[in-house]
Amino acid sequence: MIITSSAFGAELVVMSSVGARSVMDELGPQFERASGVVLSFRYDTAAALQRAMEDGARFDVAVLTSPVMSVLTAANKIAGADQSTFASALIAVAVKHGAAKPDISTREMFVQTLLSADKISYAKEGASGQHFQRVLKQLNLDEALRDKLLPMTGAKEIEAVADGLATLGVQLTSEILPVKGVDLVGPFPGDLQNRTELKIAVSTESKSTDLARRFIAYATSSAAAEVIRAKGMIPP
């Protein structure tokens, strides 16, 4: 990648779902060194970022779940022609580091594991948490587990497991792996799984569209795919 005088020192604001943070923490500095562009990241749940964008927050690039991206495209916040699939991730379970890993390979064992847990933390607004709540209703466990559930905000649901506040944590694989003090048990089994797709796109109000497109090209390159895999996500 060639550094140009117009790019050097320019800034791009990237609003990204926390599910992609571990990937962006590596790709971002690589792109900055190669391009001379300064990246400013804002991480939150896709739902929280959607509200911020609808309220007028300025950004150049967005990394969001597909449903949220569709809503923002319809609202003319995201350029429909400048979108690419970034990565996808599976919803998984975590336990405190060193704790016995339960068998969740089948629906039956998954249910038994949930019923045996003292506390289960999950993201109140995140895509993984929303799917988990749907799964509980599907399994008719929402009432049985009501007193065991710890809905959390601020991406603290896996830290709660590390701190001993929860026995199990539910989150995307890519959000479990970077957290110290926890171990990945594995993904939700079979038809209880939901593959969360993230897309990357340019803001309709970006003043640096060309640079934004360059970053998207970098983030969806074959070299980026290696980083995506290493961080527990699935490249397109």
Q: What are the roles of these predicted feature ranges?
A:
Residues 1-5:
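Bacterial N-terminal signal peptides
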Residues 8-55, 63-75, 80-89, 95-236:
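Exported/periplasmic ABC-transporter solute-binding proteins
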Residues 59:
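Dinucleotide-binding Rossmann-like beta1-alpha1 core, especially the glycine-rich loop
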